[in-house]
Amino acid sequence: LFKKAAVFTDIHFGLKGNSKVHNQDCENFIDWYIEQAKDNGCETGIFCGDWHHNRNSLNLTTMDATIRSMEKLGKAFKKFYFFDGNHDLYYKDKRDVNSTAFAKHIPGITFIDEVYEEEDVALVPWLVGDEWKKIKSIKAKYLFGHFELPSFYMNAMVQMPDHGELKAEHFEHQEYVFSGHFHKRQKQGKIHYLGNAFPHNYADAWDDDRGMMILDRENNAEPVYINWPDCPKYRTVKLSQLIDEQATLIKPNMYLRVNLDLPISYEEASFIKETFINNFNCREISLIPQKQLEEISTQL
């Protein structure tokens, strides 16, 4: 199926209400991913689900960014394999209506809509109904999918509960399982959650280990992860920390949620926001009063 593959997942085109900024981040990521794949000699690309964010509709500006990116991927690789995650599907219990099947008409893109096995590799789209029971019978050494496995972290704080269906131990025959779905990069045993393409919101705060993975199957090598250095970054900080560490803390394309642990006036708050956004090329600075912060903590 491949000698050396460049793999990514969970890019979520159309996130944040079809934000132009987010879709441009997605396109910038695709350009970086292709460049890294070429620099590392990858002839094959694989995407592990959740291309689009909105399950119900597609905005035309998002579609425009999607088609442009898909065409780039089709040209960049000998083959680019692509399967759906749950966000790409209209129905929860079947895959027949989705937002991505048009990609099979783009030269170079191979759209996988059923469990696919070739040599020692299996590609598995989002499982529906009782399909999870088939996992035990897949013999492939390398398995790529979009799985919801218990005990892994959905984000930095929340662990996935056990719903009594697919579990890590069902992957009996695999040596490596690579999955999309959970946005935090993590590994337990043979199961690797790749993590999303780049941080999307404050659930990803302080965790920039996002990007892509390279798998050199020809040389039986361990997976290698590459972080996207120019990714948007999310930080939650205290105002006192921000003032002391502004030179090292703030980076371009950063979203900052600042907890007001010091008394400041409205004018000072406006000055801080304007100065930091202009001087450091921040995207957003939200100032959170202490009382509001306590309410947020309670709701969690």
Question: Residue spans of the language-model regions?
Answer:
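Short, well-ordered alpha-helix to beta-strand connector turns
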Residues: 42, 77, 119, 138-140, ...
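Conserved beta-sheet core of the metallophosphoesterase superfamily
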Residues: 156-222
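Core catalytic region of metal-dependent phosphoesterases/phosphodiesterases
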Residues: 4, 11, 15-116, 170-174
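Short, conserved loop/helix-junction motifs that constitute active-site signature segments
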Residues: 73-76, 136-139, 168-173, 249-251
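Accessory, non-catalytic peripheral segments of nucleic-acid enzymes
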Residues: 216-300
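Active-site environment of divalent metal-dependent phosphoester hydrolases
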Residues: 12-16, 53-56, 83-94, 128-131, ...
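Divalent metal-coordination and catalytic microenvironments
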Residues: 10, 30, 45, 50, ...
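Conserved catalytic scaffold of divalent metal-dependent phosphoesterases
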Residues: 66, 84-169, 194-197, 218-219
